[in-house]
Amino acid sequence: MLNIRTLIRPAAALLLAASAACAMAAGQTLAVSIIGPGGHSNGNYGHVNAVHAAARSIMLIEKSVPDAVVTAVTGGNSVNSIAAYANFRVLLEGDDAALKAKADKVKAAVEEGCKAENAFRGVKTGEVRDGLAADIRWTIK
């Protein structure tokens, strides 16, 4: 006679092992927002550009975290304006320690990309022009 317990135990063990293997890999999504003063390309020529800062940041992310996936890139609102904002998401995978290390690298890349855009336009951190913050600022959530 067939014992149901002898069938259930191996199946349960296999299911448990598969679940444990899946639980080892984790994912994290970072939402990056970059803002600057923006402006019209004629009257505000030379202002920092949030889309340019995002592009610089994404290129640096690609170098420092090659397996990261950058998605949902948005920014600017017109062909003749200097973008005041840019947003993108970074998808990371790995265990907890790897995620922390990758998130730190993404943060460093975004900081470096934004600093590069500020430096390219000769803007110092905290500088004010025409009553507005003149530099690129960023957040990661």
Where is each model-derived feature located?
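Bacterial N-terminal signal peptides
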Residues: 11-21
